[in-house]
Amino acid sequence: MSAAENRALVERWYRALENNDFDAIFEMHHDDVIYNMVGNTLVSGRIYGKDACCNGMIGEKLLEKLIPEEIRFATSWKIIAAEGNRVVGLMQGGGPTKSGEMYDQTYCEIFTIEDGKIKEMHAFFDTVLVEQCLFDNTLSTPEQPLADPFQIN
């Protein structure tokens, strides 16, 4: 496929996210797709396979924390670059969580396209927001008093 065709596929992917059309999203993925999710959160890591990426990571780990009727993963998006079999996009989206938080996330995604399907995706996003809004982790660290604040070790 050409860079223009790969770009068009990712544009369809973002439009499907705008409309919460998860069946269309599922069909756009290669059976052996790999998701590379930044960070050390419960949605981070390297995820293998269409079912694990689409139903497991998106369906179980994300959608179960959000109010499905109100979530819009792609409220705005833009393709930044398309060259060869790679496409880079920026996306903003989110909505209310079941715990009452607002999950408004910004993503940078790098797609690799193979045989007209998404073969691999690297996703970069605010992992602190994921922890706080989706997994109720305040990430607070107890204050440690300094013995001598002017001492340098």
Predicted regions and their residues:
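Short, aromatic-enriched amphipathic alpha-helices that serve as compact interaction elements
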Residues: 3-21, 28
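Hydrophobic pocket/interface hotspot
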Residues: 10-13, 25-26, 33, 53, ...
